[in-house]
UniProtKB/Swiss-Prot annotation:
Assembly, per entry: F-type ATPases have 2 components, CF(1) - the catalytic core - and CF(0) - the membrane proton channel. CF(1) has five subunits: alpha(3), beta(3), gamma(1), delta(1), epsilon(1). CF(0) has three main subunits: a(1), b(2) and c(9-12). The alpha and beta chains form an alternating ring which encloses part of the gamma chain. CF(1) is attached to CF(0) by a central stalk formed by the gamma and epsilon chains, while a peripheral stalk is formed by the delta and b chains.
Intracellular or extracellular location(s): Cell inner membrane
Membrane topology: Multi-pass membrane protein
UniProt similarity note: Belongs to the ATPase A chain family.
Keywords: ATP synthesis, Cell inner membrane, Cell membrane, CF(0), Hydrogen ion transport, Ion transport, Membrane, Transmembrane, Transmembrane helix, Transport
Protein name, UniProt field: ATP synthase subunit a
Any one GO CC term of the record: proton-transporting ATP synthase complex
Gene that encodes it: atpB
Gene Ontology terms: biological process: proton motive force-driven plasma membrane ATP synthesis
GO molecular function, one term: proton-transporting ATP synthase activity, rotational mechanism
Listed transmembrane segments: 43-63, 103-123, 160-180, 193-213, 232-252, 259-279
Function as written in the Swiss-Prot or TrEMBL entry: Key component of the proton channel; it plays a direct role in the translocation of protons across the membrane.
Taxonomic source organism: Pseudomonas putida (strain GB-1)
Keyword Lipid biosynthesis in record: no
Length: 289
């Protein structure tokens, strides 16, 4: 255990491996939340970046391998799994996306599998990966957070990429004038030109809040659920390491029970992120408000 107290243990497991400029002007790793905060905006969460990229490459490798081994005869287990995933996502896109775009289904598949893989790391016992990082680095105080979706920087980055696509397709389908009109002429309208002009600021405020709420809610929903799930695992680990025999036994039972339930959570959160992305992009392809 990297920290002697329960609170220190929890704080250590909820801190990212942060690299940035230290208060003395040198560059290095933060060993406390205070040091990470002092680094400011231009600090890098290397654990989030590393795991996100690694799991993305694993996703590409698995699906590429399945595509290369695809045969018209008897398919193997991996090919069956990939085909089920592709059919499931393709069906979800057909049911929810009402426009025409060849990139939506591949985007939805990428989001679902990538987010699921990042969420699935939460099923690894909470001490294994941080202890491995300590073993490799030789620093007993270095933090390491393996679940990328418990970092709001990761979920917000994905959500604002979706937001950029919403803006892009809104302008592409409706034109710049149509997009601006959508923000300023709805939900309140009037046949009187003077009244309509007066309503523009009100409409813009309401529509802007609705628009910007999409990526924020998309990111915070995923982050909040995964952060809470990770915190429960950490609290169970604290109970397990309390030294009391009956609490340790209860901790084992709770750990397995929560892990089984968490399989549903990680899958559901990946599905929700994918479905909301499809719905938002479908709305961006609609000509009418």
């Amino acid at each position: 255990m990297a920290a002697e107290t329960a609170s220190g243990y929890i704080q250590h497991h909820l801190q990212n491996l942060t690299y940035g400029q230290l208060p003395d002007g040198s560059w290095g790793f933060a060993h406390s939340a205070a040091e990470a905060k002092a680094m400011g905006f231009w600090a890098f969460h290397l654990d989030t970046l590393g795991w996100s990229v690694a799991l993305g490459l694993i996703f590409l490798f698995i699906f590429r391998m399945a595509a290369k081994k695809a045969t018209s005869g008897q398919p193997g287990g991996l090919q069956n799994f990939v085909e089920v995933m592709v059919d499931f996502v393709n069906g979800s896109v057909k049911d929810s996306f009402h426009g025409r775009s060849p990139v939506i289904a591949p985007l939805a598949l990428t989001i679902f599998v990538w987010v699921f893989l990042m969420n699935a790391v939460d099923l690894v016992p909470v001490d294994w990966i941080p202890q491995l990082a300590i073993l490799i680095s030789g620093d007993p105080h270095i933090p390491f957070r393996a679940v990328s979706t418990t970092d709001p920087n990761a979920t917000l980055a994905m959500a604002f990429c979706v937001f950029a696509l919403i803006i892009f397709y809104s302008i592409k389908v409706k034109g710049l004038g149509g997009f601006i009109g959508e923000l300023t002429l709805h939900p309140f309208g009037s046949k009187n030109i003077f009244v309509q002009i007066l309503l523009i600021p009100v409409n813009f405020l309401l529509e802007f809040v609705t628009l910007i709420a999409k990526p924020i809610s998309l990111a915070l929903r995923l982050f909040g659920n995964m952060y809470a799930g990770e915190l429960v695992f950490i609290l169970i680990a604290v109970m397990f390491g309390s030294g009391l025999l009956w609490l340790s036994g209860l901790g084992v039972v709770l750990q397995w029970a929560w892990a089984v339930f968490h399989i549903l959570i990680i899958t559901l959160q990946a599905f929700i992120f994918m479905m909301l992305t499809i719905v938002y992009l479908s709305m961006a392809h609609e000509d009418n408000h």
